[in-house]
């Protein structure tokens, strides 16, 4: 008696994981790439709109952000009002300063920061807005 086995009946002794590893590496690459863009992130601020205004020439400037919650950020790092004061004391008065205030931020917070800049003699101060 002759027993013939077809190829379909062959027992699988182990699973081939190479395709799984390939897919995982592709997914890891995608996640790391998108995480880089997210990590650069910005502080979520909704800029007010204005009909007038002009584009500012890109140069090394200090960006002060005021959120609608009243938090102050200096170069994407949250700081207290006192820390901002200390930083501005050491800064060259000719350095351009950009105020990036949320349109729903309290006017009081904006005025405090703007007054501080005037108090220390900063003349090159810009308010960032979104063009209508």
UniProtKB/Swiss-Prot annotation:
Location in the cell: Cell membrane
Main location: membrane
Keyword Membrane: yes
GO biological process entries: protein transport
Membrane topology field: Single-pass type II membrane protein
Alphabetical list of InterPro entries matching this protein: ExbD
Cytoplasmic side: 1-17
Gene Ontology molecular function terms on file: transmembrane transporter activity
Signal peptide as annotated in the record: none
Disulfide pairings: none
Alphabetized UniProt keyword annotations: Cell membrane, Membrane, Protein transport, Transmembrane, Transmembrane helix, Transport
GO annotations of cellular component type: plasma membrane
Residue spans crossing the bilayer: 18-38
Periplasmic side of membrane: 39-132
Binding partners and assembly: The accessory proteins ExbB and ExbD seem to form a complex with TonB.
Family recorded in the similarity comment: Belongs to the ExbD/TolR family.
Function: Involved in the TonB-dependent energy-dependent transport of various receptor-bound substrates.
The protein's name: Biopolymer transport protein ExbD
Species of origin: Aquifex aeolicus (strain VF5)
Gene that this sequence comes from: exbD
């Amino acid at each position: 008696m002759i027993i013939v086995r077809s190829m379909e009946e062959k027992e699988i002794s182990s699973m081939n994981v190479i395709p799984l590893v390939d897919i995982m590496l592709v997914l890891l690459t995608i996640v790391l790439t998108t995480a880089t863009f997210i990590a650069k992130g910005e502080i979520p601020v909704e800029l007010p709109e204005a009909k007038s205004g002009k584009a500012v020439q890109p140069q090394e400037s200090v960006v002060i952000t005021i959120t609608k919650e009243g938090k102050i950020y200096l170069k994407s790092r949250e700081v207290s009002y006192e820390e901002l004061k200390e930083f501005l004391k050491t800064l060259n008065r000719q350095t351009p300063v950009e105020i990036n205030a949320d349109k729903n931020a309290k006017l009081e917070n904006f005025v405090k920061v703007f007054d501080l800049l005037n108090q220390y003699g900063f003349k090159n101060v810009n308010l960032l807005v979104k063009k209508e």
